[in-house]
A protein has these predicted regions:
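Short hydrophobic beta-strand element within catalytic cores of glycosyltransferases
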Residues: 38, 290, 299-304, 309
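Aromatic "clamp/platform" in nucleotide-sugar-dependent glycosyltransferases that forms part
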Residues: 94, 263, 282
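N-terminal strand-loop element at the rim of the active site
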Residues: 3, 7-15, 19-70, 240-242, ...
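A short helix/loop element that forms part of the nucleotide-sugar donor recognition site in Leloir-type
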Residues: 74-77, 180-195
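Active-site donor-binding acidic/aromatic loop of nucleotide-activated sugar
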Residues: 241-244, 254-264, 270
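Carbohydrate-associated surface elements
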Residues: 155, 173
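A conserved mid-protein helix/loop that constitutes part of the nucleotide-sugar donor-binding site
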Residues: 15-23, 200, 204-223, 240-246
Length: 383
């Protein structure tokens, strides 16, 4: 008998949570577990066509902020009969400021209630601290509602559930083979972007939002570009800060050097086109993009606050303090002033020479989606 779950956490932007969900549902046996998706967006969500092809229903609610009364009315009506339709609800969370999905699931007798943390901090706390206080209050109440707690990393679990909470770590696993270095994909994307084979291309994959620190990324690239005026940057993603970023790019005179792609569903080819991956996030749960970049055998330069649970290809994994500033980041990336454990960082090559297939290392580190999906499937089906 097929078990049916209600999934939350999908948005119109194909970010890390969305990537985790898609990696999971693509590898779970549909004859055992199927999913529907509860969303608060009028727009088409990421991967919606693929989800519908899998047989999923997309339950669209009126926006909570735009139409609060209509949202509440439709929301309550939907949950009233949800206990009869669903075997469980799987809530993907960035904070506990709002736990309505958990409380309404409990109230309406959905049997299995799962909370999965994908975040290790939240700079989105409002100035009055209301969201933070709500998060802390709900954290103390969580065991009244959620049957099972998952987290993408220990840091994400401690932030969401508390340091003494009983949670299980499920890594944001990927299809490692799909991200293995491919010269063919590299050539294809570079041709598409009109970037020559011997141009040094830096890049990142992430939303244009405060958490991902896009303004700092641009500042780092500005320093890199001063040293190498022929280099380019590709920012794969979209978000609310895009207009601000494009304005700043213009002010720096980097319109021809810094490219923003917008939202992309399949990012695998873009990693192949890059020569180095820059990732100065303010905080992360466990970033899928960093796992994907390592799977592509890219040199990765990242914030020193990101959990070492993400370290897979050690020789490509370089942490740099954010407070060092953009110039220090650029110098480290260029190999002028390595800060990684006192060792000089290797200079980033101009051409992708020696890129390897590191898929077995990704799998050995516990980031193989086949293994992770099987583990989750067992829980969702058997409990």
């Amino acid at each position: 008998m097929v078990k049916r779950y209600l999934m939350t956490g999908m948005t119109p932007n194909p970010g890390g949570v969305e990537a985790y969900i898609m990696n999971l549902v693509r590898h779970i046996d549909p004859e055992k577990v199927q999913f529907d998706y509860l969303v608060n967006y009028e727009e088409v969500i990421a991967y919606e066509q693929e989800l519908r092809t899998m047989g999923a229903d997309i339950i669209r609610l009126p926006g909570r902020r735009k139409h609060p009364v209509a949202h509440r009315t439709v929301y309550r009506k939907f949950f009233k009969n949800a206990g009869e339709r669903y075997d469980g609800i799987y809530c993907n969370l960035l904070s506990l400021a709002n736990i309505d999905d958990l409380t309404y699931a409990k109230k309406n007798k959905i049997n299995r209630i799962i909370a999965h943390s994908h975040n290790s901090n939240d700079t989105g706390w409002d100035l009055m601290g209301i969201r933070k206080r709500l998060h802390q209050t709900h954290q103390k109440e969580l065991d009244q509602y959620a049957e099972k707690l998952f987290a993408c990393s220990n840091m994400a679990g401690w932030f969401m559930f508390g340091e003494n909470a009983n949670f299980e770590v499920i890594h944001n696993a990927i299809d490692a083979e799909r991200f293995c270095f491919s010269q063919e994909k590299r050539n294809q994307i570079r041709t598409q972007l009109k970037i020559s084979p011997d141009t040094r291309l830096y890049g990142t994959v992430g939303r244009l939002e405060e958490q991902k620190n896009p303004g700092f990324i641009l500042d780092v690239f500005r320093c890199l570009h001063e040293k190498d005026p022929e280099c380019r940057f590709i920012h794969v993603g979209d978000g609310s800060l895009r207009g601000e970023m494009e304005k700043k790019i213009g002010e720096y005179g980097l319109e021809k050097a810094y490219l923003i792609t917008g939202a992309v569903n399949d990012t695998s080819g873009y990693y192949q086109a890059m020569d180095a991956f820059i990732f100065p996030s303010l905080y992360e749960g466990l970033p899928v993009a960093l796992i994907e970049a390592q799977a592509a055998d890219l040199p990765c330069f990242l914030t020193d606050t990101i959990s070492d649970e993400t370290k897979i290809v050690e020789e490509n994994y370089h942490k740099i303090p954010l407070n060092g500033g953009a110039q220090i980041w650029a110098e480290t990336i260029l190999g002028i002033n390595g800060l990684n454990g006192g060792h000089r960082a290797e200079a980033v090559p101009t051409i992708a020479t020696g890129r390897r297939n590191v898929s077995e290392r990704v799998k050995a580190a516990g980031y193989d989606i086949t293994q992770a999906a099987k583990q989750m499937e067992e829980y969702l089906y058997y409990g």
